[in-house]
């Protein structure tokens, strides 16, 4: 399905990201993963095993460093012949306080890891997709982007901005054979989330692998007519 395609998956060593990496590799893509902890990438490679890991590549990269991201993605395109797919999974949650008690430092941190990383990755990848004559972008937003709650303003604002980014990309690239879509998960069924909320009904949570299959559809040939969409992937959560 994705043979000959080159994909970048940010946040690819995390629970959702690694499921996306596995799914894209299984579909035949070559996958490149930026990481901040080499041991996490080594663990990912070991868990994937051969032969899938033979099509896995990556490098240490600060996704908030514009110059470094531009250089790294240019190197990916040079080494692998281009960039066809970008999946922006990198991000993180912080909350717990109402707006009037939330420091600007926390706002900045949430904007940096959830929005800036995606903006810089899109800006660096799109020129290489244009050179290839097409591509697909999937940005991970959140249910919180459209259904806010108490004490999550900074995170929700950053994820809401991801939707605007996605819509802008779709409008700008619609005549260039490049699609841009967003997915909106809620609580994902991961060991860390189970440990953090042991009394929750975990059967209502969505497995990372299920979300990864939606990503696979969005970057595949059957989704070429879909762009600018924000797709809920939170099931009963």
Segments (PLM) and residue ranges:
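Conserved glycine-rich cofactor-binding loop
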Residues: 13-14
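Conserved glycine-rich Rossmann-like NAD(P)H-binding loop of the short-chain dehydrogenase/reductase
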Residues: 27-44
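Substrate-binding pocket helix/loop in short-chain dehydrogenase/reductase
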Residues: 97-99, 106-111
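Active-site helix of classical SDR
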Residues: 122, 158
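Alpha-helical segment proximal to the catalytic Tyr-Lys
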Residues: 127, 170-175
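Residue(s) in the substrate-gating loop at a strand-loop-helix junction
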Residues: 142
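C-terminal helical subdomain
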Residues: 175, 182-183, 190, 200-237
């Amino acid at each position: 399905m994705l043979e000959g395609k080159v994909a970048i998956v940010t946040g690819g060593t995390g629970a959702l990201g690694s499921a996306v990496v596995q799914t894209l590799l299984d579909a035949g893509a070559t996958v490149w993963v930026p990481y901040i902890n080499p041991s996490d990438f080594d663990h990912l490679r070991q868990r994937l095993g051969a032969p899938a890991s033979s099509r896995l590549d990556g490098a240490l990269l600060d996704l908030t460093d514009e110059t470094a991201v531009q250089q790294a993605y240019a190197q990916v395109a040079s080494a692998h012949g281009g960039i066809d797919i970008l999946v922006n999974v990198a991000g993180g949650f912080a909350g717990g306080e109402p707006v009037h008690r939330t420091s600007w430092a926390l706002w900045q941190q949430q904007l940096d890891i959830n929005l800036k990383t995606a903006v810089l990755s899109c800006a660096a990848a799109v020129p290489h997709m244009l050179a290839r004559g097409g591509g697909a972008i999937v940005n991970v937003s959140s249910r919180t982007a459209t259904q806010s709650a108490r004490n999550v303003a900074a995170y929700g604002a950053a994820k809401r901005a991801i939707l605007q980014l996605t819509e802008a990309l779709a409008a700008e690239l619609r005549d260039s054979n490049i699609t841009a879509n967003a997915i909106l998960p809620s609580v994902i069924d991961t060991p860390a989330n189970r440990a953090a909320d042991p009394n929750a009904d975990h059967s209502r949570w969505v497995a990372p692998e299920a979300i990864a299959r939606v990503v696979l559809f969005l970057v595949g040939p059957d989704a070429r007519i879909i762009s600018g969409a924000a797709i809920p992937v939170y099931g009963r959560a």
